[in-house]
Amino acid sequence: MQTLPDLIPFDPNALLLGYQKRWVADTSQLKIAEKSRRTGLTWAEAADDVMIASLAKSEGGSDVFYIGSNKEMAREFIDACAMWAAQFNRAAGQIQEELFNDEDKDILTYVIYFASGFKIKALSSNPKNLRGMQGVVCIDEAAFHEKLAEVLKAALALTMWGAKVRLISTHNGVDNLFNQLIQDSRAGRKSYSVHTITLDDACAEGLYQRICQVSKQLWTPEKEAAWKAGLLRETATEDDALEEYYCVPKASSGAYIPRPMIERAATEGKAKLRFECDAKFMEWTEDERTVITSEFCLTQLLPHLQALNPDRRHAFGVDFARSADLSVYAVCAVQPDTARHFDLTLEIKNCPYNQQKQIMLFMLANLPRLIGAAFDATGNGGYLAEAALIRYGSSMVEAVQLNEKWYREWMPKYKALYESGYIQIPKDEEIILDHGHIQVINGVPKIDKSRSKDKSGKRHGDSAVAYCMAVRASYMTGGEIDFIPLPDKHSDRSENDEFDDFISNWDW
């Protein structure tokens, strides 16, 4: 499958806009698009379908079946296919009207036949119509089909012999099957390739510029802003505007992971440590701070690291903070049954950058079968991420810029672990409360802006972010690094000698 950039600037000479090109280039057997109104994605689908139907069978050609929610949509789609056939100079007959028997009623449908022997045909939404068919199935405005589950069941049966299924729609409520398919795909429970196209996404790649080009208007940023504002202003409610133009299904608000589900995952025996620096810590010299931190690593951290199961693969996640919130370092053990166990959590408060780096490198060096690390590299967090990248390389370390796209991709996978019972976290009230900060905001599960209090200050969902980072790191496939244990404490050398070597050899 051809991979295209996430942002393709507008080209007035190109037939398709960037998001349309990515949709066509995606050859996944199952793909789904949540989109803003009138972004032209069905038009791009028509271009792709003409290419498919015009190819010989040996080249991957096949029939295409379009299922819209009404007759007018069917005619509009077939007209678009005819236009593309002429544009591509693909041999095709005229649009034909045929009578299709649908439950003892003769339904007028539209079809184009190609010289390849294949056709593009518009069908009604009766799932029985797909019986005996083979080819690409496009279900347009899927969220508005009364029998979507039955139509989809019939369409998916075709995939046994290599057929492909495309679902395109704006949203129609948070509980709609269309939205559930998207959430299940993001959580990894289903394998649809998901495309998200908001009004802002489409405009960033030239939607309004194309509208101006076609209507022979002069485009300016000010005109585009006024046009968008007008669209949003005319919708009945803000919720309607978000659903129609920003892919946010209605009624999507509140806690993302229910507390009972989090409490079910809370497990006795999962270690939680804390390293807190008081005001005097900054008065020590750098060497003194290094020694103090090293002592914590050797006396407090190391026993827990050595207690980790050496047969399990381990991932590492970090949510960074310098003073206002906590830094949280999370160690995730991947179990043979794919469950994720958070066997060690370290909370760091008011700690200088160098000492946070020191602790981070110490933990990574002592993790059994390390498979990956993910860091919140937003803002000052980039310092830690860069240090890890230099040491372990980009195949083992991901520096994450926290944004809606990342949350949209990884929070559903994280939530799915709770839903399936495949996660264990420390049985700790503060960590449970952290997860209450994951809220669905404008359709995206992410950390809200509120803060809760712990014994020594404010929290901001810190452990929830670190855990999600570690889950992301557990999917990394860059390799595996095993740890080299420190010399046995019962060896002939003294503890002071070991400590001196540790200090002198460490890359601060």
UniProtKB/Swiss-Prot annotation:
Pfam families: Terminase_6N (PF03237). Disulfide bonds: none annotated. Coiled coil: none annotated. InterPro entries: P-loop_NTPase, Phage_Mu_Gp28. To phage Mu protein gp28. This is Mu-like prophage FluMu protein gp28. The lineage of its organism: Bacteria, Pseudomonadati, Pseudomonadota, Gammaproteobacteria, Pasteurellales.
